[in-house]
């Protein structure tokens, strides 16, 4: 019997680690483009997993997690850009559409 190894339908390797300086109030065009691409990738993954869960009868909804992706991506970039200033832990109140803390 031949074993097949299905591939994940999204290329998660396109995620681009981004380091932002939290003291800088503006983004460069390149930083903005990277941030937007990372947000879209994560949102697409959330929708994918919600849809495949729905197909199995075990899903909820994308609402809160989908809505908080921009905050999470910005926090991740701050964690990378100034690691000495942050404890790199995300608290999201279970994705119930509250601000990520």
Language-model regions, residue ranges each:
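Thiamine diphosphate
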Residues: 2-101
């Amino acid at each position: 019997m031949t074993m097949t190894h299905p591939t994940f339908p999204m290329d998660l390797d396109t995620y681009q680690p981004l380091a932002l300086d939290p003291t800088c109030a503006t983004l460069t065009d390149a930083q903005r483009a990277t941030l937007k691409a990372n947000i879209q990738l994560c949102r697409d993954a959330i929708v994918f997993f919600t849809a495949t869960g729905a197909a199995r009868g075990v899903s909820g909804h994308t609402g809160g997690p989908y809505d908080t992706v921009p905050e999470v991506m910005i926090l991740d970039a701050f964690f990378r850009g100034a690691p000495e200033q942050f404890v790199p832990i995300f608290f999201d109140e279970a994705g119930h559409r509250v601000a990520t803390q």
